[in-house]
Regions:
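Active-site beta->alpha N-cap acidic-glycine motif
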Residues: 16-102, 254, 258-259, 285-290, ...
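Boundary at the C-terminal end of the N-terminal hydrophobic targeting segment
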Residues: 10-14
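Metal-dependent polysaccharide deacetylase catalytic core of the NodB/CE4 family, i.e.
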Residues: 76, 81-158, 217-252, 283-302, ...
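Well-ordered, non-membrane alpha-helical segments in soluble/globular domains
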Residues: 51-67, 92-101, 128-138, 260-277, ...
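Acidic-aromatic substrate-binding/catalytic surfaces of carbohydrate-active enzymes
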Residues: 386-460
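Active-site-adjacent pocket scaffolds in enzyme catalytic domains
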Residues: 16-19, 152-282, 358-363
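Bacterial N-terminal signal peptides
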Residues: 1-7
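Surface beta-strand/loop "capping" patches
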Residues: 342-386
């Protein structure tokens, strides 16, 4: 299979993977991917859950969607990911839809790629089957686009370490949206425990940053949705004062524009965006926001209601607002951004992501709360406090990556392997007895020692 990939795609693939001209550091980057599918959740080639969405996957929706983005952000480049069924559906509407998206690659420079298993491929398929899906799905993308085209990345939701290794070593693809940061008790699978900015994954677990050269998989692992750091603490969702507090509240439309309406939804989206493009940029030297905006949402109200909303007005205002507030921001494809990061970081040794976020006052983003995140190769650490009351910080997450980790086995026939999370010391979701918040100096001595080596300032004098 490795030889096949090289023979079929060698020349054009080399052309497609030239290093990006721009640089990572000093940049603000937005990546934006959209999913084209037939059924709501296509977990295997033959099995799907949820409604048939084919009536809202037509050239009309795609054209309106892409023209809205171009109007708001001329020069923007986005990533389109086709499901297995959408790649192979021979109805006229899907043939025309595929042809239209190919023109967007030529016109705008968009990326066209494949998504296996509706974000949840490993929850329903063996690793071997996922590799087959990746190979044949990517081959089909190349056939549709023509000219020896190969995408720089894959959209996958969650993807196991073995499959990430396969992408890098056999398919020659070194960027994958392979984790959904903080997702737990939402939809069809859990994968809580990673860091939220790019990293090289470990061969042990896709959520774990590689610890050394032998452990490193050369496939940059990207988050799928930027979420509000305070909302992310919730396991799934909960009702508070007759409102639904949702853990995925951030820059995606379902939890914002479609749930709250345009005005309030935009406020929540900009709060999550500014956390990275303002304070995060200063702390980390670059900033990244990413959104997954499924194509079905253009007219999803026809199937799912959404209070009659489609979110497109909000999308245009969000993109226009980003350009106005951060005029240096770039909207590039997921593959380009991942390769940009890969060109700068050769391993995880220098990773030291830090974020400080105060709530915007919308639902789970509580206005009196401040959260600080520290993320590196060895661990992630989250400290929470009531900043208005000037309360003492509490550790709500401490996940060690320097300890062994193991992914679940392949799902048994006809069954699902739902939880692929990496949790050890304390987890932000608070689902286990050991997850009770505690002061930094109440952690185990060896845990304090590890943190002190990285961030001595957290312990005072």
């Amino acid at each position: 299979m490795a030889t096949l990939a090289i023979v079929l795609f060698g020349k054009s693939f080399a052309e497609e993977t030239k290093s990006p001209k721009s640089e990572l550091m000093g940049g603000r980057f937005l990546t934006f991917n959209t999913i084209v599918r037939v059924k709501q959740i296509e977990v295997t080639r033959a099995t799907s859950h949820g409604p048939d969405e084919s009536e809202i996957h037509t050239p009309a929706e795609a054209r309106f969607f892409r023209e809205t983005i171009d109007k708001a952000w001329p020069g923007a480049k986005i990533t389109w990911a086709f499901s297995w069924l959408a790649l192979h559906d021979e109805r006229q509407s899907y043939r025309e839809l595929r042809e239209l998206v190919v023109t967007y690659k030529k016109k705008f420079g968009d990326e066209i790629t494949f998504i296996p298993g509706a974000y949840f491929s490993n929850m329903y398929n063996s690793r071997e089957q996922v590799n087959r899906d990746l190979h044949e799905g990517l081959k089909r993308v190349s056939e549709i686009v023509g000219g020896g085209y190969r995408p720089k990345s894959v959209v996958a939701g969650f993807l196991s370490a073995d499959n990430l290794k396969y992408l890098a070593e056999v398919e020659g693809i070194h960027v994958c949206q392979g984790n959904i940061w903080s997702q737990y008790a939402v939809d069809n699978g859990d994968g809580e425990g990673s860091i939220c900015y790019p990293y090289y994954p470990s061969r042990e677990h896709f959520c774990k940053p590689a610890q050394n050269e032998k452990d490193l998989i050369d496939c940059v692992n990207l988050d799928g949705w930027t979420v509000d750091f305070l909302a992310a603490r919730i396991a799934g969702s909960k009702k508070v004062n007759d409102e639904r507090w949702r853990s995925r509240q951030g820059v995606g439309p379902i939890e914002t524009l479609l749930d709250m309406g345009t005005e309030r939804g935009l406020e929540a989206m900009f709060a999550a965006t500014s956390s990275h493009f303002d304070d995060g940029f200063k702390r980390n030297g670059f900033a990244w926001v990413t959104s997954g905006w499924e194509m079905c949402l253009v007219e999803g109200r026809k199937i799912y209601g959404y209070g009659g909303r489609n979110g497109m007005e909000g999308l245009e205002q969000w993109l226009t607002g980003i350009r106005k507030r951060w005029p240096d921001a770039k909207l590039i494809t997921q593959g380009e951004f991942g390769e940009l990061w890969r060109a700068h970081y050769k391993n995880n040794d220098a990773i030291n992501y830090q974020f400080v976020h105060r709530g915007c006052g919308i639902r789970a983003s509580e206005a009196d709360k401040e959260i600080r995140w520290f993320m590196n190769k060895d661990f992630r650490l989250a400290l929470l406090r009531d900043w208005k009351a000037n309360s003492e910080e509490q550790v709500i997450d401490f996940t060690r990556y320097d300890e062994p980790a193991q992914e679940p086995a392949d799902p048994e026939d006809g069954k699902k392997s739902r939880n692929w999370s990496l949790m050890n010391r304390i987890n932000q979701k608070g689902t286990r007895p050991q997850d009770q918040p505690k002061r930094l100096n109440e952690l185990l001595d060896k845990d304090q020692e590890l943190i002190r080596k990285k961030y001595p300032e957290l312990f005072g004098k």
